[in-house]
Amino acid sequence: MKAIFTAFFLFLICNHIAGSVWAFDSQDLENFELLKICENCDLSEANLKYGDLKNAVLKNSNLEGANLHAADLSGADLTGANLKNANLSEADLNGAVLRGVDATGADFDNVNFLRADLREANLSTLDVSLERLEGATLCNTIIKSGTQNKNCR
């Protein structure tokens, strides 16, 4: 019985520590949901699935592991954001600014990149034909097939 209690206690402590290390900042999320502006925020692991994030400002924010599946990020500014291992499948990035983002390991399945600014972005796990990136700005943009330069100004 003592062993079970000890194991349960250790489980609770580990969950608390892991939760505080890996979870988003709840105040950042609350402010973002209210204003759609959150620069330098910690929204790591946040569930923003199907979110209406049109024209949101998330400059230099931590969105590592965030769930942005089917989110409307059209016109959003994600300059310098950490999108490592984020789920952006089926997201709308039409006209979004992803300049300098690190999206290593992110899921971009069926994403709309029309008019997106992808300059200096690390999308190294993005396995996509250049036709799907038609209309996007690619300058020193890293995708799975290598560094791309297209529509540079």
Q: Can you say where each PLM-predicted feature lies in the sequence?
A:
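Cleavable N-terminal signal peptides
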Residues: 10-11, 21
